[in-house]
């Protein structure tokens, strides 16, 4: 089965945190409203966004779930390689040679617009 090391999980958490302001912008929500969606306090969202606290894996999966439920943020996390094939294989408990069983529908024209440097 595909595994993610603690270091890989932490890298994903840090990467997602760096994109949270843009994700909130795409959802058109404040830190408070976003916190209510993902089950975190406004101060916790703030320190995660400012890099003063590394989100937990449970917080990562909660935020990723909200992103996956919204077309714009789903495209955004896909375009910025936060939602990857390996992550999906891990979450679905797949072997390395078995692709994830997810149909990720995206608007291809929008992917370049969402990609960050």
Which positions does each model-derived feature cover?
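A short, Lys/Arg-rich alpha-helix, primarily the initiator
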Residues: 1-26
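Recognition helices and adjacent regulatory flanks at domain boundaries
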Residues: 2-10, 31, 62, 75
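Helix-turn-helix DNA-binding elements, focusing on the entry/boundary residues of the two helices
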Residues: 20, 31, 42, 57-60
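Short, charged recognition helix plus adjacent turn
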Residues: 72-117
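DNA major-groove recognition helix of helix-turn-helix/homeodomain DNA-binding modules
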Residues: 55-79
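Short alpha-helical DNA-recognition segment
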Residues: 28-47
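The alpha-helix within a helix-turn-helix
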Residues: 24, 35, 64
């Amino acid at each position: 089965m595909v595994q993610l090391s603690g270091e890989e999980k932490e890298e994903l958490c840090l990467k997602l945190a760096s994109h949270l302001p843009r994700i909130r912008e795409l959802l058109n929500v404040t830190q408070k409203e976003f916190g209510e969606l993902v089950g975190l306090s406004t101060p916790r969202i703030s320190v995660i966004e400012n890099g003063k606290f590394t989100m937990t894996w449970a917080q990562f999966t909660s935020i990723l779930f909200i992103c996956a439920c919204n077309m714009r943020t789903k495209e955004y996390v896909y375009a910025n390689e936060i939602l990857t094939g390996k992550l999906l294989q891990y979450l679905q408990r797949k072997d390395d040679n078995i692709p994830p069983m997810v149909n990720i529908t995206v608007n291809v024209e929008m992917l370049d617009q969402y990609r960050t440097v």
